[in-house]
A protein has these predicted regions:
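Transmembrane alpha-helix termini and helix-breaking/packing motifs in multi-pass membrane transporters
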Residues: 39, 43, 154-173
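Cytoplasmic helix-loop-helix junction between adjacent transmembrane helices
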Residues: 108-150
């Protein structure tokens, strides 16, 4: 029994690290957008009241729907489906670089927040089940969060680098920044499929 547990430990740690990388790429996308969205919308001439309304609604949906997603994910047992749909909705961020229509941009911002609500409870459930009897839930979440925070740091740097390379901070540069986020999105979905 002891030998079996020891053999499984490297696999469990690998899964935890992969979950961390998935979260990291998700955070690169999310934090990049978060650092740029308000200024991008401002450059499009959208007033502060509308921007505040969409961000407020997005945050509300992002937290309220976690409860709904958690209940549905537990009742159905389809945690992976919730993860794939939730992370898949991050495609909304790179797509923001393809449109100047503010109505569509608002929908994309809300989509990203809804995606976060769908994936978070499912991801936490899977991670806790994988790690519970092998390494401990606290250690697993600690490792995953540590890797995840790298993404929170790297995300805003993407737009900074785009502005630095082009030498200006204009509408086109914001669109390039959003489009570049397709790369971490593809990597994220690849890692997610691999872990699945």
């Amino acid at each position: 029994m002891m030998d079996t547990t020891k053999k499984r430990l490297p696999l469990v740690f690998t899964i935890i690290i992969l979950f961390g990388l998935i979260s990291m790429f998700g955070d690169i996308i999310y934090e990049s957008a978060r650092s740029a969205n308000s200024q991008y919308l401002n450059l499009l001439g959208i007033n502060a009241a509308k921007i505040g309304l969409v961000f407020g609604l997005g945050e509300f949906l992002g937290y309220f729907l976690r409860l709904v997603a958690g209940i549905l994910s537990d009742k159905s047992g389809k945690h992976w489906i919730f993860m794939f749909i939730g992370y898949g909705m991050l495609i909304s961020v790179p797509v923001m670089g393809l449109t100047l229509n503010w109505n569509f941009l608002f929908i994309l911002i809300l989509m990203e927040r809804i995606g976060k609500a769908l994936r978070s409870p499912a991801k936490d459930t899977i991670l806790s089940k994988v790690s519970e009897h092998k390494v401990g839930v606290g250690i697993a979440f600690g490792i995953q969060e540590a890797v995840d925070q790298i993404g929170a740091f790297l995300g805003p740097l993407i737009f900074t680098l785009v502005f630095y390379v082009t030498g200006k901070e204009a509408l086109n540069q914001y669109q390039v920044g959003y489009r570049v986020l397709l790369i971490p999105f593809i990597l994220l979905m690849g890692f997610l499929y691999y872990v699945f």
